[in-house]
C-alpha cells in the first residue's frame, strides 16, 4: 500500500491556493489604490466635496480679475484633484482651467519681463525712458531734485 505524499499540490487544496491573487506583485500598487483620495491637500481636515467645488469655482473666476496667482493657489490647494484624473470631475474642470490660465499668464509675464530686461533701450529706443518706472518721481517732480 502506497502512502500519499502530503507535499503533492494537486492533492492538498490548501497549498494549491495562491496567497496573492493580484497578478501585479508590486505591494505599493495595492496601498495606493486602496488609499482614499481627498479633494484638497489637507486631506480629511479639508473641505467637503460640495464646499471644494464652490472654492475651486471662486478661485477660478477671481483669477480673471487680474489675480492670476489665485489660479496657482487653486492648483496647489486642489493638487490631489490634478493628480488623480478620474476623481472629482466637477472640481477638476476648474482646477485644470486654472492650471492652463496660470501657465499662459506665466509665459506672457516671463516673455514681457525678458523682452524688457534683455532688449532694453536698444529694442524700445526713445520710448524706453517713458516705459521704465524708476524715474517716475523725477518726471513728476516728486523727488525734490528738480
Curated annotation (Swiss-Prot):
Q: Which UniProt keywords apply?
A: Membrane, Notch signaling pathway, Transmembrane, Transmembrane helix
The Gene Ontology CC terms held by the record are: Golgi-associated vesicle; membrane
Subunit (UniProt): Probable component of the gamma-secretase complex, a complex composed of a presenilin homodimer, nicastrin, APH1 and PEN2.
Its GO biological process terms?
Notch signaling pathway
Q: Where is the segment annotated Disordered?
A: 1-26
User: What job does this protein perform?
Assistant: Probable subunit of the gamma-secretase complex, an endoprotease complex that catalyzes the intramembrane cleavage of integral membrane proteins such as Notch receptors.
Lumenal topological domain ranges are: 1-61, 120-146
Which organism's genome codes for this protein?
Answer: Arabidopsis thaliana
Q: Which residues cross the membrane?
A: 62-82, 99-119
Q: Cytoplasmic topology: which positions?
A: 83-98
**Cellular compartment(s):** Membrane
Stored InterPro entries: Gamma_Secretase_Asp_P_PEN2
Q: Under which name does UniProt file this protein? A: Probable gamma-secretase subunit PEN-2
